[in-house]
């Protein structure tokens, strides 16, 4: 969710990992004259990410399009602490959807309503 905010702020994602939500909140408040909390900013990011997902759905994205490159699913990691492991996307993706409040790759109507995105419901 923070990544969506960083992208929306027009900042470089590659250099963003040195800062966290509190620092980006201060930057956003200074630039916009707002008084957001880090929690507010993360919710804004969650809203952005869900809107992006609904845009992708409207553009024709299907659940089967939500995948990693075949190499990451079949080639074991060659070295380091994760040596020998491959991605278990078939296990982790449904768990990720559940945590996000999504079903089959897209936000549920309940998630959209919770985020105040009523205009996206049923689309």
Which positions does each model-derived feature cover?
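Extended C-terminal regions of large enzymes
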Residues: 1-123
